[in-house]
Design a protein with these regions (language model features):
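Helix-to-loop junction immediately C-terminal to a conserved catalytic motif
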Residues: 51
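Conserved ABC ATPase signature
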Residues: 134-138, 142
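Conserved catalytic motifs of ABC-family nucleotide-binding domains
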Residues: 155
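ABC ATPase "signature
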Residues: 219-220, 228
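The feature captures the beta-strand-to-loop junction immediately N-terminal to the Walker
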Residues: 36-38
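Conserved ABC ATPase "signature" region
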Residues: 104, 111-129
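Conserved ABC ATPase "signature" C-loop
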Residues: 213-214
Length: 252
């Protein structure tokens, strides 16, 4: 069953700038799908439409077989975790309070929130002692781990991730990529991950969708795209033969 479905969706920001053109895309339960493309290709817009942050001009979006316009927007967003590059942790709250924020506004018992925060901080590879700290006391990589933990707090079925590791150093970035792959394997959440980094897209995704100017150019598994690029645009986007051979050795 498609957990998320786009049916002939169009979106523009003004009359002469169409950012999503006739989008038809189904995302199955438990998939880790990476959306890749150049800046301005429409990737982040897709996440915002899934989360109800942006209305569509025409077409339909379904979440769990229910058209998005029929959802209570608060209930929808509580069932979707969102992780962004800027993280957005509340600086005046402890890490425990940040992780438990969504549960707190749902009036979950305090003890349940505390136990959930402990479970999640361990799940993302951090010790319980970090729960007492504040965001300013953490490194960039640690704050991103907390951001992932917070996104998982309400046990959502869907996790949206928008260039979440773009602001950290390369070593930390690779470590976070490894962590999110393990989390997906362990929790089987549906993850929609936006990136402009080709290697990251192939490392993480069970399916890759390549966008250009608001349209899907090619979608498929790592093997399908690497072995059978649809056209010259895809070939050029993937890079030179040396890099493509590297991707094949790493991911096929």
């Amino acid at each position: 069953m498609a957990l998320i479905k786009f049916d002939k969706v169009f979106k523009s920001y003004d009359s002469d700038k169409i950012v999503i053109k006739d989008l038809n895309l189904s995302i199955e339960n438990g998939e880790f799908i990476t959306l890749i493309g150049k800046s301005g290709s429409g990737k982040t817009t897709i996440l915002k439409m899934i989360n109800g942050l942006l209305p569509i001009d025409s077409g339909k979006i379904f979440i769990k077989d229910k058209e998005i316009k029929d959802w209570n927007i608060i209930e929808l967003r509580r069932d979707i975790g969102y992780v962004i590059q800027q993280i957005g942790l509340f600086p005046h709250m402890s890490i425990e309070e940040n992780i438990g924020y969504v549960l707190d506004i749902k009036n979950e018992p305090k003890q349940n929130i505390k136990e959930r925060a402990k479970y999640l901080i361990n799940l993302v590879g951090m010790k319980n002692s970090y729960l007492e700290k504040y965001p300013r006391e953490l490194s960039g990589g640690q704050r991103q781990r907390v951001g992932v933990a917070r996104a998982l707090a309400a046990n959502p079925d869907i996790i949206l991730m928008d260039e979440p590791f773009g602001a950290v150093d390369e070593i930390t970035r690779r470590s976070l990529q490894d962590e999110i792959v393990k989390l997906h394997q362990r929790l089987n959440k549906t993850i929609v991950f936006v990136t402009h980094d080709i290697e990251e897209a192939f490392k993480l995704g069970t399916r890759i969708v390549l966008f250009e100017k608001g349209s899907i150019i090619q979608e498929g598994t790592k093997k399908e795209i690497l072995m059978n690029p649809k056209n010259k645009f895809v070939e050029d986007f993937l890079g030179n033969k040396i890099f493509i051979n590297y991707l094949k050795e790493m991911f096929i």
